[in-house]
Design a protein with these regions (language model features):
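Alpha-helical transmembrane segments
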Residues: 9-12
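Bacterial N-terminal signal peptides that target proteins for export
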Residues: 1-7
Length: 148
């Protein structure tokens, strides 16, 4: 009985280890950046939709963080498709010009969002349209290039 349990536990551990992504790999690095982008975007959107209290300074800081993050993940997409565990469709590598075009669009709209936050005090209503453009840029890339 003990021997059988040991075999099952070792097999489970081996399978779990196979599913982990090396955090230093290109896949691991871009996943971490995208997760940080998602969390930051959700906080900003939450402030504009009333899920979180609106704090102009915090929103402005989050916009700068999101803009910085928006420039980072693209360097972690290698020229050739990487291994399993990626949510990226093969089209990322097959249509790189379009992929990079959408990346530049995201960088542009996050930069615009930062620009709007420079005029204090911030008005949540005035931030809705620029934030909507950021979310639309994210969605456009996900629709074309991400497996859901």
């Amino acid at each position: 009985m003990f021997k059988r349990l040991t075999v099952v536990l070792l097999a489970t551990l081996a399978l779990t280890a196979c599913e982990r992504v090396d955090p230093n790999s290109p896949l691991g690095q871009r996943k971490a950046i995208f997760k940080d982008m998602l969390n930051t975007s959700e906080d900003l959107g939450g402030m504009l939709r009333g899920r979180l209290p609106f704090d102009g300074m915090r929103f402005a800081e989050g916009a700068v963080k999101l803009d910085t993050l928006a420039h980072e993940p693209w360097q972690h997409f290698p020229q050739a498709r990487d291994g399993g565990g990626s949510s990226a469709r093969p089209e990322v590598w097959e249509r790189q010009a379009r992929f990079h075009d959408l990346a530049r669009q995201l960088e542009g709209v996050t930069g615009e969002l930062v620009g709007v936050t420079r005029s204090q005090p911030l008005d949540a209503a005035g931030l809705k349209a620029p934030m909507d453009r950021v979310e639309a840029a994210c969605k456009a890339c996900h629709t074309e290039f991400r497996n859901h």
